[in-house]
Amino acid sequence: MTTITGLTVRDIRIPTSESLTGSDAMNPDPDYSAAYVELLTDHPAGLKGHGLAFTIGRGNELCAAAIEAWKPFILGQSLEEIRGDMRSFWRRMTRDSQLRWVGPEKGTVHMASAAIINA
């Protein structure tokens, strides 16, 4: 059985607004950003998972903070149990009684959950 032993998250930002790279009528000054998550395991081969939630700048720290908030729910989980019932894992994350007020299955909660699940 492979167990998740660590979770790190980084708030990565690329100053694309300086050159207006990726700008358009709706997004005049985007700074391409990502809340990047890495899951560590006890697998003998050093198995890791990587995922991200892509944003265009402001608010990226909210996704990173939401990922950090789920750390206690993730650490100690077995990959086999998660893969065996992804639906329950998704619901456990997006329907937490104290975190769901941030946006159940939408917005920050949805993006942060997706980053963890993709990792």
How would you label these PLM feature ranges?
Residues G6, L40-A119:
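Metal- or metallocofactor-binding catalytic centers and their adjacent structured scaffolds
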